[in-house]
């Protein structure tokens, strides 16, 4: 049985021709591909980059033209090249039994339309915040509407999160993760450590506007201006379109000595870095269920996170596995940083609770949940780690 994945994810090849990508995408595609006999992955291509993770070795990779520009310019570019996109997608989707669409995204949305038109079994996962907030665009509102309308039958619709009540009728919650069972068995945090002499803060993720990093810079600067000592050191792990602007902002704000940009790291490098950190800070303006929260907790790091998406369910009570702050509120973030970094806290207990919480959030469990939902909704068989297609 063949799976086709339609994504706008940027990927690259090394000198040997192996395909790589960043973040949790290649790991999740590996987990998903393991459920099928064959997999086709449709992606966009960039120049060779650092810190990548290999796509499934036996996957067929089909390169889509990279949309040019941003905002409306990008939308017009996609519309102009729609015949090329649709032609390529139609050829690959026609030969597949199941199509996986990671939303939000313009190219995946086109792929979803082709899959519906060809009456294919469809798995759609919305990776952003399912709640409607002031960060929602007309495009993301349309995508959520389309998922609600199409949910059921051949269309397995998944929203990123956890909960007992479905996100919408005929839809399901699905957590997200980049953690493997092997990684959890390998990573052994020092649960007994408190704060470092110079507190080590870390942000993990894409350096993009929705992550709210300028607010974190402002909170850090406010701590310095108030004479807080010792001044914490902030490490930003990740790449993204805002990196140059953030480096400039840090310099203008006089934070260059306190902020480090590592760029994209592979999983091993990420783990090595996280084991030296004290607290993760994720000041996102919008989020579904962040893989960064789980990565941090796997390394015994409590998380200071904006109260968005599933943060309240993941963080728990104040001080349980971290702390919540109002999104975009510099004063609230500064206050919480001061409180966490200056108050006597049961660090050992907090770190142990973080690690224990994420034990079940593995890619193996993620793939099993998707397989179980497929069998329940489509009446398919699932044995020996593979889905068995039963034509309906």
Predicted feature residues:
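Short alpha-helical donor nucleotide-sugar binding micro-motif in glycosyltransferases
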Residues: 93, 264-265, 272-277, 370
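A conserved mid-protein helix/loop that constitutes part of the nucleotide-sugar donor-binding site
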Residues: 199, 203-224, 241-247
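Nucleotide-activated donor-binding/catalytic signature segment of Leloir-type glycosyltransferases, i.e.
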Residues: 247-265
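A short, well-ordered alpha-helix in the C-terminal region of glycosyltransferases
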Residues: 258, 339, 346-360, 372
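Aromatic "clamp/platform" in nucleotide-sugar-dependent glycosyltransferases that forms part
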Residues: 285
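Short glycine/serine-rich donor-binding loops of glycosyltransferases
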Residues: 290-293, 311
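Short hydrophobic beta-strand element within catalytic cores of glycosyltransferases
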Residues: 302-305, 315
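Conserved acidic donor-binding segment of nucleotide-sugar-dependent glycosyltransferases
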Residues: 317-330, 339-345
């Amino acid at each position: 049985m063949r799976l086709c994945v339609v994504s706008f994810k940027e990927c690259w090849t090394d000198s040997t021709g192996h395909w790589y990508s960043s973040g949790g995408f290649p790991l999740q595609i590996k987990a998903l591909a393991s459920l099928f006999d064959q997999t086709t992955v449709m992606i966009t291509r960039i120049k060779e980059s650092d810190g990548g993770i290999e796509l499934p070795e036996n996957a067929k990779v089909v390169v889509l033209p990279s949309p040019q520009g941003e905002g409306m310019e990008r939308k017009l570019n996609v519309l102009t090249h729609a015949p090329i996109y649709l032609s390529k997608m139609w050829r690959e989707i026609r030969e597949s039994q199941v199509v996986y669409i990671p939303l939000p995204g313009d190219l995946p949305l086109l792929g979803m339309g082709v899959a519906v038109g060809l009456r294919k079994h469809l798995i759609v996962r919305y990776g952003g915040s399912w709640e409607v907030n002031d960060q929602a665009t007309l495009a993301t509102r349309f995508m959520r509407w389309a998922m609600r309308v199409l949910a059921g039958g051949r269309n397995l619709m998944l929203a990123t999160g956890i909960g007992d009540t479905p996100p919408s009728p005929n839809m399901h919650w699905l957590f997200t993760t980049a953690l493997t069972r092997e990684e959890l068995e390998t990573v052994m945090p020092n649960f007994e450590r408190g704060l470092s002499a110079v507190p080590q803060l870390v942000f993990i993720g894409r350096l993009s506007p929705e992550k709210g990093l300028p607010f974190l810079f402002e909170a850090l600067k406010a701590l310095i201006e108030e004479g807080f000592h010792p001044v914490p050191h902030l490490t930003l792990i990740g790449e993204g379109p805002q990196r140059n602007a953030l480096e400039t902002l840090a310099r203008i704000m006089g934070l260059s000595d306190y902020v480090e940009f590592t760029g994209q790291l592979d999983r091993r490098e990420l783990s090595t870095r996280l084991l030296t950190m004290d607290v993760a800070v994720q000041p996102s303006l919008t989020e579904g269920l962040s893989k960064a929260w789980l990565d941090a907790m796997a390394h015994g790091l409590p998380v200071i996170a904006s109260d968005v998406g599933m943060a309240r369910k993941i963080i728990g009570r104040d001080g349980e596995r971290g702390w919540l702050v109002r999104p975009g509120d510099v004063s609230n973030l500064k206050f919480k940083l001061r409180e966490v970094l200056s108050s006597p806290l049961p660090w050992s207990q907090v770190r142990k609770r973080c690690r224990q919480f994420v034990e079940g959030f593995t890619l193996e469990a993620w793939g099993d949940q998707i397989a179980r939902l497929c069998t329940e909704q489509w009446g398919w068989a699932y044995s020996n780690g593979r889905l068995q297609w039963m034509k309906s």
